[in-house]
Amino acid sequence: MKIGVISDTHDQIARVKKAIDIFNQEKVEIVIHCGDIVSPFTLQFYKKLNCPIKFLLGNNTGDILLHLKYAKNFGLRDYEFGTFFSLNLGGKKVAAYHGDNEEITGALIKCGDYDCVFSGHNHISRIEKIGKVISVNPGRLLDNYKEGANPPSIAVYDSNTHDAKLINVAD
């Protein structure tokens, strides 16, 4: 099973559209958004996804009731909002959390309950294997905000190979 992972989109409409196109091309079966959607108007673009999406609330989410209203008004299908997801996907136990508390993120990785931990928040894309756990932070969609920062990116995790890849979504 292929799982799309995106985070910290911060209203970057062109890159959100590009990410959705990539997820559809990759034939992911679900997308996990690790938080910081920011403005609810951007939810309309996720309608083009060919799969369900789960949105984590980040530290820049804004009014959750407004997000729920917009999701419904835009006709977004098969979606869910939450602060934490513990999921069984493709035979793997997956934890998804925004990542704004590094101690919690670290505890999820080290606890032994999960095969995968998806997080965001710090805008630093990385894929790291820690023991049997793969930790995926897809990075952000914002422009490079500091010298030497990784380019804007998303990630795709494959439960069959227990591996992930980062995909550059820079313009």
Q: Predicted segment positions?
A:
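Active-site glycine-centered loops adjacent to acidic/histidine catalytic or metal-binding residues
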Residues: 8, 36, 58, 98, ...
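Core catalytic region of metal-dependent phosphoesterases/phosphodiesterases
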Residues: 2-88
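Active-site-proximal segments of metal-dependent phosphoesterases and phosphodiesterases across multiple
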Residues: 61-112, 142-146
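Beta-strand-turn-beta hairpins that frame and shape the catalytic cleft
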Residues: 1-4, 86-95, 129-135, 161-166
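Conserved beta-sheet core of the metallophosphoesterase superfamily
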Residues: 54, 100-161, 166-167
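Short, Asp-centered acidic motifs that coordinate Mg2+ and/or phosphate
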Residues: 30, 94, 115-116
